[in-house]
Amino acid sequence: HVRRYLAYLDQARYARRTANRHLSSIKSFYRWLVVVGHVPSSPAEVIQGPKQGKPLPRVIKQSDMERLLSATFAGKRPEDISAIDLRDQALLELLYAAGLRVSEASGLLCSQVFMDEALLRVMGKGSKERIVPLHKTACLALARYFGEGRPALMKGPSPYVFLSSKGNPMSTNAIRAVFKRALG
């Protein structure tokens, strides 16, 4: 009966979450029936609810992205652009153009950047490697960061692309803070 009821909910186009809530209530009711002795066991305990779909990732609007990419240098004279500004611009361009995850950008090594070919070799989730092409704008921002910004941030040798003001690899939280600053 319980499976038929779940099939009815599916045919009636109820959301999976709603069907799972109904199933949870039925299971609770049967557990109570077992406790008070009305039934010997719960037939609902072995039934699994419908699988929940994964939500789509949030996507930033194009107007917000344009504002984000122009925020780093906004209102600054060329001589006032700092190493941090160059890093942040390269970081934002790279995240946008290459579709990197924050964790991938945080762990990106210089040996994984191939400027001549405009490619990145990225270690993604589950240690899966992928090759990512770079847009011209991201290449230009990275080249400027490698030439002017990164050397000013280095306090010693580091294999990481994106460095903090102390010369350490940028953490994922520090990268998220760049987004927050840029979005105001």
What feature does the model see in each segment?
Residues 1-184:
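Conserved catalytic core of the tyrosine transesterase superfamily
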